[in-house]
Amino acid sequence: MKMDPRQLINNLKPSSTSAATATHPHCTPFTLPSNGVINLGASEYFTLTTNAIFNPECTGTADIVLTGAGTPTSFVDLRDPFYASTIPACYALAATTVIAYMLVIMLLITPRTFLVQGAVVLGRRGFTNGPSGSDAGIGIGGRPWLQKVAALTVAISLTIATADTFRVAEQQYELGLMNASALQEEVEGGMELKIIRIISDTFLWLAQAQTLIRLFPRQREKIIIKWTGFALISLDVLFSLLNNFVYNGNSRPRLFTDAVPALAYLFQLALSLLYCAWVIYYAISKKRYAFYHPKMRNIFLVAILSLVSVLVPVVFFVLDISKPTLAAWGDYVRWVGAAAASVVVWEWVERIEALERDEKKDGVLGREVFDGDEMLEVTPTSDWTKRFRKDNDDKGGTATGSTWPAMSGLANRYRSHATNDLETGSVPGQRTGRHLLAVRPPLWPTRPQPAATPINRADTASAESTAYTVRYHPISEATPPIISGDTTLSRSNSEAISISRSISNEEVDSDKPVVLEQTNQAAAVAAGLHNWQWNSLNPFKHRVQGPPAEVSLHTAKPPTPFSSHESSNKWDVRARIEGFAATQAERFREKTRPTVDTDPLPLTVIPAPSRRRAVATESEESDTDSISPTPDESSHIEVTTSRRDRPARTTDPYTPDSLNQHSITHRGSISFATAVQPELDQRVENATASPTLVGSRQTPTFSSSRSSPITVRSPVTPSLPPIIDGLPVTTIPAPPRRPRVENP
């Protein structure tokens, strides 16, 4: 078979018979059949043994190919940039997955730490106990369960995304291509990832709302943040469901064609911007502690991590507009950044609050109270998450991880969790061991109960009362626990010790004794020590709440030996691990602690100078011995220690009747120092042996009428000088008054 050469290759020089070939050259390759003869020149012929494919040269594209042959840059625009390829996407996904699992480990396993005199030390309590105080110092590290669930769902979501990414990347590798956009669309289009991502986003927004609630102390602000966050989170979840399951699931700003994807993107952007703005505002308001403090120098690193975590979602939202191709791996960074924004900021806020409490623990001001806040029942447990709990955290004494812990200091600590408090007085047998350990000390000392009838000045709580309560509590002892049961804190069951003694029965009502109320503490202390070994390493057991951290740091407590065999539950692995870590940390601190020189220092005793009272006493004693009593007066000895020469006075109960008495003031209570009984007995014996007798001075009676007769005072000379502070003091008697004679 012989073919015409002009029918095959003469396209550049068309013949006159083939006008269509000249005007419309075809570029479609065609097959040459076998057994054909091809003529390549005058003497070159060869026969095709098999079918051959002939690709003609296209006149329309030949010049373009030849022109671009020397310029390689013309072919670069046909590919995506490197930051939008699959390699950065895979690395970003791997890094974010590792960070997510690190957050989960930090929230669930890491033990609690405490700030003790500026040093952050390891504690025995885990993060499951929540942000409560500690006797060792100010606690840092409590985490709510919303953060734990959010971090766990983010880690699960990124794990699913990693598996799908490697599966799609393997398919593209087998085809010999790399398409990051197609990989991202196929991974995000999976049904499993859509469901877990909606759940994860919900818990992330809730955890961020909980963190914002802790930033602001006022109850009004907390309520506003809670309900505003509810509204925005609900709308975001609604539009995310519509975008993923009703529409095509588009999340690129430049590719929006419907309103629902744009609204879903808008609510995500609004939540991120609001959270970032309020965290930055809080950092500026707490700039004294937020960025640097001498007692906690590493807070600068926590501040940098917190600001980066809250700014990362905002930065990548902006990059979606300017660099759309960067969104292939920017979604993963935004995802884990939202989880870190809640966890790291919570740690930052705890450290700031710890520094504030450590600095203000020596102050005299109490807790900050705002107008409109009800402090009796508004506590962190009264939040919207309380309805989802099954463990009933109100039975405990501390704020657990399921609470809003912004106000977990004063109100929650002193709430009446037990069934029988000091004022109701229920049956002791109805109280269990758990309730016995949950009793809290009262917020302020309980006032004595006033007597009913008849009215007794010694039992009333008014300013006219003749008995004043003094509660003695040395600084070297811890705050005594409260006795549970039928016992009520009143005068009837307290041990009244009267220091002032009087022999005369007429002046019993005029004297003011000092009453010391001491409660029996042996039973409560024994019960606390009996259950201490089992409760020390159990992180799920509510423990006895001691005094606040601001008070307990100033109380001297005996060192309690720590035993490594304290856990009664052998399957409590977490408690054993935390106890072992705490024991090793204590041993390491004991080894590294510098030795303190305990040699006794030299003691120098400087005697006190002589007082002027000694000189005055000698002269007064000489004058007293020269005075003798009248024969018509009754000879008896009167020993009194308060209001000896003056009548009882009810107008001013806070001023001592004699200048020799000392006024002892304790929180508004005033009592007068008197001589003790042994000194009185000694003085009575001396007076009996002396030949000089003393006539008693009768106390005049007061009447409301000015015309009532007045009892004449008889001259009297005191023979028993009172003793104040160990020094005898003699009182100079007043001269006798003349009786008033009425005009006839």
From Swiss-Prot:
Membrane topology recorded in Swiss-Prot or TrEMBL: Multi-pass membrane protein
GO cellular component: plasma membrane
Region feature Disordered, mapped onto this chain: 387-407, 441-460, 550-570, 584-664, 692-744
Localisation: Cell membrane
Coiled-coil regions listed: none
Feature: compositional bias, Basic and acidic residues: 387-396, 586-596, 633-649
One of the GO biological process terms: cellular response to pH
UniProt keyword terms in alphabetical order: Cell membrane, Membrane, Transmembrane, Transmembrane helix
The UniProt record lists the keyword Membrane: yes
Biased composition (Low complexity): 696-715
Main location: membrane
Keyword Membrane: yes
InterPro entries in alphabetical order: PalH
Residue spans crossing the bilayer: 89-109, 223-243, 260-280, 299-319
Function recorded in the entry: Required for the proteolytic cleavage of the transcription factor pacC in response to alkaline ambient pH. Might be a pH sensor.
Family classification: Belongs to the palH/RIM21 family.
Official protein name in the record: pH-response regulator protein palH/RIM21
Originating organism: Botryotinia fuckeliana (strain B05.10) (Noble rot fungus)
